[in-house]
């Protein structure tokens, strides 16, 4: 396997696509530096763009050719609320295999009280006074979300509820 100093920029696109944790050429920071050096301004801006997917988005019924084109062109860096391993995998395949640099998409979802297995809202679980109940629910939610291809979730939410008028108090453990 090729090796290079940490400040080396990979100039060949095919070499950049081969930058995986199993290839000694790259550490994560080296891969990032290499990709950023090759990116156009539009591709860099695309990494800041998070598209709304909708919980049941599938490529066959919901994703338009225009949206796929944006993924191919590097105009989308992440998706919010695309549920299920199949649509995530299909979107990821387009990003990795059909975009210029093969940069993977990030996928995120609100998993405040479950992903596939739905649990009581956090405020209700807190009312049980049993931290193990909450811990078990969050472990199950994390396992389900990560196995479906999600990279990050917006949970658990650990803000202290100081004002009962706050509309998202139900997502916290309360005061």
Locations of the language-model features?
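N-terminal Sec signal peptide cleavage junction
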Residues: 1-5
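N-terminal beta-rich core of secreted/periplasmic extracellular enzymes
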Residues: 9-175
């Amino acid at each position: 396997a090729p090796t290079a100093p940490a400040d080396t920029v990979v100039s060949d696109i095919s070499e950049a696509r081969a930058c995986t944790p199993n290839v000694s050429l790259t550490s994560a920071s080296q891969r990032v530096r290499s990709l950023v050096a090759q990116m156009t301004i539009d591709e860099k801006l695309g990494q800041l763009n998070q598209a709304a997917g909708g919980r049941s988005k599938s490529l066959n019924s919901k994703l338009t050719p225009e949206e796929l084109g944006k993924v191919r062109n590097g105009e989308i860096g992440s998706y919010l609320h695309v549920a299920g391993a199949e649509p995530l995998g299909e979107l990821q395949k387009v990003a990795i295999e059909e975009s210029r640099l093969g940069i993977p998409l990030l996928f995120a979802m609100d998993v405040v009280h479950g992903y596939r297995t739905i649990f009581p809202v956090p405020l209700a679980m807190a009312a049980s006074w049993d931290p193990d109940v909450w811990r078990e629910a969050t472990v199950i939610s994390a396992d389900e979300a990560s196995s479906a291809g999600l990279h990050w979730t917006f949970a658990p939410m650990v803000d202290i509820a100081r004002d009962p008028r706050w509309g998202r108090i139900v997502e916290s453990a309360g005061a």
